[in-house]
């Protein structure tokens, strides 16, 4: 089950880079995910979830801007994979299976990045505009992250 959750949080990172890691940070801060004593303990620190949430909100805004680069360019793609990998490790770490979590989270980020781009493109074409498609993607990312964290 832990690998499925790591994969799913990776998919969320593929949709929205900061949403996945912000959700994991909230889980650690609220005590749903024990990262104490690990190199990821900082995710549960007092201000970390607030900072990551602010960054996630900023990402929601900048994603709507016309000059924002594609999620498939190397820097954007790499950031999503890194976020998915770290989030996957955080989910798997309490069980001692961090390598599997890293792989599952990174793989999920690739799936989320490519699948999310394709789905959003089709939805934007169907709706005639990108903004509604982007907002649907935002909602899926947030609800998905909450559901994954809720299953921890």
Tell where the protein language model's regions lie, with residue ranges.
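Alpha-helical transmembrane segments and their juxtamembrane interface "caps"
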Residues: 25-26, 30-34, 43-62, 76-80, ...
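C-terminal ends of transmembrane helices
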Residues: 57-72, 114-126
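Cytoplasmic-side transmembrane-helix entry/capping segments in multi-pass membrane proteins
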Residues: 70-82, 104, 129-136
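The first (N-terminal) embedded transmembrane alpha-helix
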Residues: 8-28
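Mid-bilayer segments of alpha-helical transmembrane spans in multi-pass integral membrane proteins
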Residues: 82-93, 102-118
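Helix-coil boundary and interhelical linker segments in multi-pass alpha-helical membrane proteins
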Residues: 1-5, 27-47, 87-103, 147-152
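Core segments of transmembrane alpha-helices
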Residues: 59, 79-88, 137-142
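Final/C-terminal transmembrane alpha-helix of multipass membrane proteins
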Residues: 135-152
């Amino acid at each position: 089950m832990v690998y499925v959750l790591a994969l799913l949080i990776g998919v969320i990172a593929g949709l929205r880079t900061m949403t996945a890691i912000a959700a994991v940070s909230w889980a650690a801060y609220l005590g749903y995910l024990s990262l104490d004593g690990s190199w990821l303990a900082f995710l549960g620190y007092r201000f970390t979830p607030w900072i990551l949430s602010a960054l996630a909100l900023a990402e929601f805004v900048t994603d709507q801007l016309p000059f924002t680069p594609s999620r498939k360019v190397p820097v954007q793609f790499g950031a999503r994979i890194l976020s998915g990998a770290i989030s996957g490790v955080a989910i798997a770490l309490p069980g001692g299976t961090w390598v599997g979590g890293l792989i599952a989270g990174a793989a999920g980020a690739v799936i989320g990045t490519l699948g999310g781009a394709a789905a959003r493109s089709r939805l934007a074409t169907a709706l005639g505009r990108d903004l509604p498609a982007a907002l649907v993607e935002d909602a899926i990312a947030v609800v998905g992250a909450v559901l994954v964290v809720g299953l921890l």
